[in-house]
């Protein structure tokens, strides 16, 4: 669920647990562990933490914000709509970064296993 807060002429959108880093970690861990049953939960946790740490270090805020120009007429509905879309855009961007990292990790593992299998086949000769 998304909640909204108005401060002066700005609207902030955040998930119902707040706009903390830890909520995003918990939510994304649940999502990827559920949707990646063949990948170790430890690997998933490492990648989720790494990606979110990189996002936090780069200055990403874990909320969506919409500011109204002082010359424009303020509209709560429009502000909420813009803030919500900015929040969801950030969330989906982070989620796709994690998915890409997981795919790379799985393909590296697959490549290593394939290489080991080839070596084992050569030994059988």
Residue ranges and their predicted role:
Residues 1-125:
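Catalytic phosphate/metal-binding cores of nucleic-acid and nucleotide-processing enzymes, i.e., regions
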